[in-house]
């Protein structure tokens, strides 16, 4: 007598009831809403960005501060610096956002930052006039423009992603770029330049006597001024070239 075995049936997926399907769909919708809300909060400049909305009325605030010879940009604001007989710091922003730009002096250095979330409608920047400038530090993401500087020595550090340009003349320029920002100093005539670039940015300088350039990163140093002495040390993928 032949015995016929019945074919085995494949394992069936568990059946979801209607209440389970409804709960699952609700969770997906809530997750999608959460993602949209998060994107709204973290995208600056968006019409939906969280925080204080600018009034659209441009205003200024003149800050009374102790004397300083160094400037540190810790926020995302743009800063213009000019050589002047008198020291002054003027903040430009929407009338209701002036307090979001912070200015304080510590150990002879003006520190410019910003606090809170906001969506500016009017141009937001800081104007600085200083009789003597010896140091610049761009740890934030803003941009700095310096004009008319005359100094025996200027030290510049750029660890952030911002950019800086400068014009004038100095005896010695020490500049270090650790981030991805660019330093446009071809308009600043320096007798001696010491340039170090650890990041991926670019340094433009004009050296009339000597240039000491170190490039352990992937950035580049481009120089003009036809210096009599050029010393280079390249250990990364970067370059030091006249241009």
Where are the predicted features?
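Extended, compositionally simple hydrophobic/Ser/Thr-rich segments
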Residues: 60-64, 68-81, 100, 109, ...
